[in-house]
Amino acid sequence: MTPLQQLAATIEARKGADPASSWTAKLLSKGPEKCAEKFGEEAVEAIIEAVKGDRDALTSEAADALYHLLVMCAARDVSLSDIEAELESRHGTSGLTEKANR
């Protein structure tokens, strides 16, 4: 199991947990809108570090953004497997072709 798969499994396991017991459970208990807001904040922080050129800070913020992306998706019952399947369906297709087919 990859670290991303392990993270997704942990997030899934926290869906029904007591919000007082974990940050993930607390965030999920606040609903998809709050999860989306938090993902947006983390994505902006990653963008800032990318612009600044700080590789270590970007790596850290990218990890935070990936975590919050998975939490946001879990809040809407979209799993990492769903995302992987979507990526697999696009594999081998030009990005321009894929975009035109949407």
From Swiss-Prot:
Listed InterPro entries: HisE (IPR008179), PRib-ATP_PPHydrolase-like (IPR021130)
Record pathway: Amino-acid biosynthesis; L-histidine biosynthesis; L-histidine from 5-phospho-alpha-D-ribose 1-diphosphate: step 2/9
Compartments, as annotated in UniProt: Cytoplasm
Example GO molecular function: phosphoribosyl-ATP diphosphatase activity
GO biological process: L-histidine biosynthetic process
Keyword Hydrolase: yes
Reactions catalysed according to its record: 1-(5-phospho-beta-D-ribosyl)-ATP + H2O = 1-(5-phospho-beta-D-ribosyl)-5'-AMP + diphosphate + H(+)
Chief subcellular location: cytoplasm
Broad EC category: hydrolase
Transmembrane segments annotated in the record for this chain: none
Keywords assigned by UniProt, alphabetized: Amino-acid biosynthesis, ATP-binding, Cytoplasm, Histidine biosynthesis, Hydrolase, Nucleotide-binding
GO cellular component, one term: cytoplasm
Gene3D superfamilies linked: MazG-like (1.10.287.1080)
Highest taxon in the source lineage: Bacteria
Record-listed E.C. numbers: 3.6.1.31
NCBIfam families: histidine_hisI, PRK00400.1-5
Family to which the UniProt record says this protein belongs: Belongs to the PRA-PH family.
Protein name per the record: Phosphoribosyl-ATP pyrophosphatase
Organism: Jannaschia sp. (strain CCS1)
